[in-house]
């Protein structure tokens, strides 16, 4: 098992942990329907960047 040779200082420990935070998801509003969805994902009603790309159960 690996064992550190020297103790890591509080500064280095903080730098090591600097990217361990949680980030809120990026949300976007669909321009045709006004529905909120995650960026670069299809909205729940099947639209992506203003175009219908997926058939849903509610389609006729």
UniProtKB/Swiss-Prot annotation:
The family note in this entry says: Belongs to the bacterial ribosomal protein bL32 family.
Q: Gene name, please?
A: rpmF
GO-annotated cellular components:
large ribosomal subunit
PANTHER family named in the record = 50S RIBOSOMAL PROTEIN L32, LARGE RIBOSOMAL SUBUNIT PROTEIN BL32
Residue ranges with Basic residues bias: 49-60
Q: Annotated region Disordered: where?
A: 1-60
Task: Give the matching NCBIfam families.
Answer: rpmF_bact
Set out the biological process GO terms recorded for this chain's protein.
translation
Molecular-function annotations in GO: structural constituent of ribosome
Name the chain's protein: Large ribosomal subunit protein bL32
Please give the InterPro entries that the UniProt record associates with this protein: Ribosomal_bL32, Ribosomal_bL32_bact, Ribosomal_zn-bd
Keywords of this entry:
Ribonucleoprotein, Ribosomal protein
Organism encoding this protein: Herminiimonas arsenicoxydans
